[in-house]
């Protein structure tokens, strides 16, 4: 490396590059270039520096540091550029330049991935770094943010009920117990190798029991929640510590209420409670409750028992809590949105349906999928058939809709890592939606 004032020269694969210390400092302390600076961000002088790497990729990455813009010539494979970015510690810079901060109203279809499994998908979950995982029966396919598939996780004919990310390197799977086998439950797997790292056990009366694990949720204080079904009416919500893997609590299901069969769990940080929703058609009736594990108390509950005088279309198919408005949003099979008031026990015993949200006037497909809900940074998302609707504002006005031309109905979708992933039912395909990076002014 040669120094002339603020100018720096590199020999990369036989090509000479000249840049400035200011440009290199944009790479950050943890990068390859960050090691060239002392603790006060003054450049050290190791002499001439030869880097035996690809010069074409180096030129792209240097331009990225200089301008913040990513321009990839057609002769450079993206896989090679990603590999070089990892060497220089610039993978986060590259990812940030490829797509911008998530905005449901500015999403565009970036890519569709096909042919990953036979049969219908169970769930798709977005990872924290832009990757995803997909459960198909007893198999889970894992993709990194470059959408390259990692080794498959196979549970040997145990059906996977749910899957969730602890962090970019670890995935939790919940599975059914197989009759007479004593397996099932919940396990922690490596996202990169598919290796089982830990199996979470459940104990009742100080005895380890077999169980089926269902819906998953995670809290910021490193707790894992899952709905549990045991053999001796041991139904309820189990709680484990992510760090130790040990069970720390269990909320037992009371007679006349449903917890162990829950379709959805959601941790509410503001209320320090867990939302538990058991929905039709898993049960004949819908049960939604908030559990406070500090007091072992169900602090709020709602059910449609005794209130089903309405048409079948008013059955609740998904639910999500909205803490800022003290309400729970629900959706029926025609994408009518409904709202239940959390400030009243039992929600006032009724759902305030918003008929103006009904969007799908066309004929239902042969194999419709139940609608799903998601809430992300003040935007509400609802899937219906082959599209996803985006609602915004205090009145939840429809502002945009995501739709592609093939793949069939959307059976699940997930938001994370500044991406939206949509899993289709009729074809082995999932879509990746991204927000375009802001223009360079």
Swiss-Prot record:
GO terms for biological process, alphabetical: protein homooligomerization; protein ubiquitination
Spans through the membrane: none
PANTHER family from the UniProt entry: OSJNBA0029H02.24 PROTEIN (PTHR14499:SF116), POTASSIUM CHANNEL TETRAMERIZATION DOMAIN-CONTAINING (PTHR14499)
Record bears the keyword Electron transport: no
Official protein name in the record: BTB/POZ domain-containing protein At4g30940
Gene source species: Arabidopsis thaliana
Keywords, ordered alphabetically: Ubl conjugation pathway
Database matches in CDD domains: BTB_POZ_KCTD-like
Signal peptide: none
Pathway where this protein functions: Protein modification; protein ubiquitination
Domain BTB, chain residue ranges per copy: 6-74
Biological role stated in the UniProt entry: May act as a substrate-specific adapter of an E3 ubiquitin-protein ligase complex (CUL3-RBX1-BTB) which mediates the ubiquitination and subsequent proteasomal degradation of target proteins.
Comment block on domains: The BTB/POZ domain mediates the interaction with some component of ubiquitin ligase complexes.
SMART domains: BTB
Zinc in keyword set: no
């Amino acid at each position: 490396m040669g120094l002339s004032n603020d100018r720096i020269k590199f020999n990369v694969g036989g090509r000479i590059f000249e840049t400035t210390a200011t440009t290199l400092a944009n790479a950050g302390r943890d990068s390859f270039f960050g090691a060239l600076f002392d603790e006060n961000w003054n450049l050290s002088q190791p002499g001439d520096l030869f880097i035996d790497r690809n010069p074409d990729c180096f030129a792209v990455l240097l331009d990225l540091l200089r301008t913040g813009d990513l321009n990839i010539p057609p002769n450079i494979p993206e896989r090679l550029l990603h590999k070089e970015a990892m060497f220089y510690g610039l993978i986060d810079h590259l990812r940030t330049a490829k797509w911008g901060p998530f905005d449901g109203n500015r999403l565009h279809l970036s890519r569709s991935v096909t042919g990953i499994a036979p049969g219908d998908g169970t769930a798709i979950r977005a990872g924290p770094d832009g990757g995803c995982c997909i459960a198909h029966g007893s198999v889970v396919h894992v993709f990194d943010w470059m959408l390259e598939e990692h080794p498959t996780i196979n549970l040997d004919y145990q059906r996977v009920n749910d899957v969730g990310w602890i962090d970019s390197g670890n995935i939790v799977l919940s599975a059914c117990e197989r009759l007479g086998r004593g397996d099932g439950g919940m396990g922690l797997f490596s996202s990169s190798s598919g290796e089982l790292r830990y199996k979470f056990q459940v104990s009742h009366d100080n005895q380890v029991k077999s169980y089926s694990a269902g819906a998953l949720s995670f809290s910021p204080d490193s707790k894992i929640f899952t709905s549990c079904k045991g053999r001796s009416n041991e139904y309820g919500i189990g709680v484990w510590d992510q760090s130790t893997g040990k069970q720390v609590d269990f909320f037992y299901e009371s007679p006349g209420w449903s917890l162990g069969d829950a379709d959805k769990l959601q941790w509410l940080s503001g209320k320090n409670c867990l939302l538990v929703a058991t929905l039709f058609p898993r049960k004949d009736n819908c049960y939604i409750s908030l559990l406070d594990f500090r007091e072992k108390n169900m602090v709020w509950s709602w059910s449609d028992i005794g209130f089903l005088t309405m048409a079948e279309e008013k059955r609740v198919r998904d639910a999500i809590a909205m803490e800022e408005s003290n309400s729970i949003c629900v959706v029926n099979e025609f994408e009518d949105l409904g709202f239940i008031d959390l400030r009243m026990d039992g929600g006032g015993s009724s759902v305030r349906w918003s008929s103006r949200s009904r969007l799908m006037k066309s004929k239902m497909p042969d194999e419709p999928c139940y609608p799903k809900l998601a809430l992300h940074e003040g935007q509400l998302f609802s899937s219906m058939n082959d599209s996803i609707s985006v609602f915004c504002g205090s009145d939840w006005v429809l502002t945009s809709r995501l739709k592609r031309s093939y793949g069939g109905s959307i059976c699940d979708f997930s938001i994370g890592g500044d991406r939206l992933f949509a899993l289709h039912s009729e074809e082995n395909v999932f879509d990746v939606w991204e927000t375009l990076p802001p223009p360079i002014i």
